[in-house]
Structures are given as C-alpha cells and as structure tokens.
C-alpha cells in the first residue's frame, strides 16, 4: 500500500531577516507552493493601549511614536487630533501647516524604508543604499525640531512643541571626513530649516528617478512583483485594507481627500491609484506618493515663510506657557505646575479620529470620563488588517513570493502587536 503524501509545514520567522520584525508564520507547502499561510502575532505586544490608560494625556503621547516606529509623527498627529476634538481646542494655523509638512516628511521616510527594504528582501541590494541616503537628511529635520531622530514627541495637543529653528545643525570635521566631504555635506545647511527643506525638495525628485531606474523597468524586479499578491477591489474593502493596499487595487480612498483634516483641504495634490492590485502596482503607488508629498511640503514651506504666528494654543489649561513667562508670572507658574503634575482634564465623551498614515488609515478611539487620563484608548492599526490578508494573498504562490508579499504589505510590528 502506497504511503499517503502529506503537505510540508514549516516555520517562517520570527528570526527570518525578511520578517520585518517578529513575524512568525506557519506555512503549509505542497512542494514549494503555498497552501496555507497562518500568521502568529503578539511577539512584540507591549500593552500600549493599557499603558496609555494609566498615564495623563500628555504622558501617553510618546507611546504613539513607538507604535509604527517608521512613521512616528503621523502616529502623534492622530492622537493629538483625537484629544483636541474632545477638548475643543483651536490649533493655530501655523502649527497646522507645520504638522502637515512633517506628516509628509514622515510619509517619504516611511516609503523610502518600505521600498528599500522590500527590494533588499527580494534581492535588489542597491536600492536601499540610495533610500537611506535621503532618509538621513529627513532624520536630520526630525532632530533639528525635536532633538530626537526617531521618537520625536514633537506634536502636542494644541499645536507643536516649538517653532521651526532658524538654522540647521552642521556636520563637524573628523578623521573620517576631509574638507571636501564636509563642504559637500554642509552645502544646503547654510540657511534656515525652510531653506534646507526647499533644497531637499529640489533634488529629491531626481533621486526618486534614480530609484525608478534601478527598479521600475528592471526585468527581475517585475518578474518578482507583477501578478504577485493580487487583491481585487472588492476583497480589499471586505478585508478592511486602507492606504496603498487599497489604492493599489484601484479604489481611490485617501482620508486626506475624503475627510480632510488640518490644512489638507488647502493643498493641491493627486492620489495615485493602481489597476491590477499586485505588488508592482503598490510599489508604483508608493513611488508616486513620494512625489506628491514633495508637492505638499513645498506648498507648506511657501506658506510658512510669509506667515509667522503662534505654534501652540494659548489656553494654558491644555498647553504649558513659555518658560520665560513661567519664570516671571505666578499664574503661568501655577498653570505649568498643574499641567505637568496633574495633567489636563478632558471633558466626558468619546471620539474616533483617523489620519492617512503612510501605511493606511491609522485611527485613535478615546473614551474620556472627565479625568486626567483616558478611560479607554483603542488604536486602529492599518497593518493589523493587512496582515490578516496574508493567507489569501500568498495562497498558490511559491515560497519565495511570501517575502515579496510581506514587503508589499509594509508591516511594522510595533503597531500590529501594540
């Protein structure tokens, strides 16, 4: 009697270099063809939602940076908008422009990392080197406004921590940098931060073209992405896909256009949409989104140059007074002390606030019972919905294509596991 053939079951991750963190998948294979892909999540669970419920509204803010740790300021933006909606704070218009500008800087940061690591996982090593060159300059912007290159905590309920600085930090000489290299590195750092941003926006589209030269018409890249991980528009909506995962399937849905927040209704930009819903279309959408982000950043920079003003609310029950005022005025000192010891008291109510995160729709749902801490804080992470589509997207493909599908989903486990 012949032995009955069984499918082969293997572990993918959590130590796999292409797992984008701590993804563990149980893969059932028929030969080298995927029969079932079962993602196991929770290995990076830190209880963020529960931790935030034990902290004041201001103390909970830095937890947002650590969710999707590639798109830090957009996480902060969603949280701040939710708190502002509950409290009813009017955010100064200059602060809104700064927020939108840094949200788009963050979108470019995310897509450079996503495309670079996706290509690297598939076998195209050069792209990530070009991507990280540009990411380095954008991380310098983060550092200049907040002092931190990743976990900025720059956005605050009511505005932003401080106005844009009048200068950009310069590289200093060392035994690794000669005078020629130093001059080249500091070339665009002679003026203000807005000058640096404008110079970046001038040269970055050419750098996107370089990335496209490496990948877009590359025969091997197309063989690894065209027709892989196809999702129909109907299934994308049924699965709760958002962002590029939805637009790549041909559904024109972008929260910045459909439900504008901050000053996105004043911005002129387009929404790139795919046709086939495969890995290649999603890659093209991300490339075009970076170009559109440059357009938005330019518009914000032009407006910020000619419109000075406050960058945080003057209601000191929700935002601290300036340090100079705090050291000279008794009322300001009391506000400062109360805000940082007791925290702000948010009126009773509940709100769901969503933003167009680089990975999709990132939502924050807050229930307030009138105390200085959230009664309940729920985070709607886009990657969580995308990962549940893994089984459907991978079924019938080869084992090597799993890596391409994980890369196109652009998953970060800080937000998936929370």
UniProtKB/Swiss-Prot annotation:
Gene3D superfamilies: Cytochrome-c3 Hydrogenase, chain B. Its EC number is 7.1.1.-. It catalyses: a quinone + NADH + 5 H(+)(in) = a quinol + NAD(+) + 4 H(+)(out). PROSITE patterns: COMPLEX1_49K. GO terms for cellular component: plasma membrane. The gene is nuoD. Belongs to the complex I 49 kDa subunit family. This is NADH-quinone oxidoreductase subunit D. The lineage of its organism: Bacteria, Pseudomonadati, Pseudomonadota, Betaproteobacteria, Neisseriales.
């Amino acid at each position: 009697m012949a032995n009955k053939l069984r499918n082969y079951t293997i572990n993918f991750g959590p130590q796999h270099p292409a797992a984008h963190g701590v993804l563990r998948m149980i893969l059932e294979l028929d030969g080298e063809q995927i029969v079932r892909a079962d993602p196991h999540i929770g290995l990076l669970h830190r209880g963020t939602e529960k931790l935030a419920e034990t902290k004041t509204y201001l103390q909970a803010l830095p937890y947002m940076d650590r969710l999707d740790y590639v798109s830090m300021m957009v996480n902060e933006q969603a949280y701040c908008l939710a708190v502002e909606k509950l409290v009813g704070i009017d955010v100064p218009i200059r602060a809104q422009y700064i927020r939108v500008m840094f949200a788009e800087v963050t979108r470019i940061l995310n897509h450079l990392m996503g495309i670079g690591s996706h290509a690297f996982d598939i076998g195209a090593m050069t792209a990530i080197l070009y991507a990280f060159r540009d990411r380095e300059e954008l991380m310098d912007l983060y550092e200049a406004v907040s002092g931190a290159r990743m976990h900025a905590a720059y956005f605050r309920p009511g505005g932003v921590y401080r106005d844009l600085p009048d200068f950009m930090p310069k590289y200093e000489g060392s035994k690794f940098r000669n005078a020629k290299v130093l001059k080249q590195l500091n070339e665009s750092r002679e003026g203000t931060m807005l000058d640096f941003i404008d110079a970046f926006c001038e040269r970055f589209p050419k750098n996107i073209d370089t990335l496209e030269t490496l990948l877009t018409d590359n025969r091997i890249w197309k063989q690894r992405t065209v027709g892989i991980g196809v999702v129909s528009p109907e299934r994308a909506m049924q699965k709760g896909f958002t962002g590029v995962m939805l637009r790549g399937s041909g559904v024109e849905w972008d929260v910045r256009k459909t439900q504008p927040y901050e000053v996105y209704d004043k911005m002129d930009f387009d929404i790139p949409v795919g046709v086939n819903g495969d890995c290649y279309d999603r890659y093209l959408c991300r490339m075009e989104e970076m170009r559109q982000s440059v357009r938005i950043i330019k518009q914000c920079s032009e407006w910020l140059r000619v419109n000075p003003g406050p960058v945080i609310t003057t209601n000191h029950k929700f935002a601290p007074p300036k340090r100079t005022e705090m050291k000279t005025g008794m009322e300001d000192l009391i506000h400062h002390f109360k805000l940082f010891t007791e925290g702000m008291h948010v009126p009773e109510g509940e709100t769901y606030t969503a933003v167009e995160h680089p990975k999709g729709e990132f939502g924050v749902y807050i229930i307030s019972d009138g105390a200085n801490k959230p009664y309940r804080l729920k985070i709607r992470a886009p990657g969580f919905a995308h990962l549940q589509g893994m089984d459907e997207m991978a079924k019938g493909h080869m084992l090597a294509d799993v890596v391409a599908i994980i890369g196109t989903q652009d998953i970060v486990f800080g937000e998936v596991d929370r």
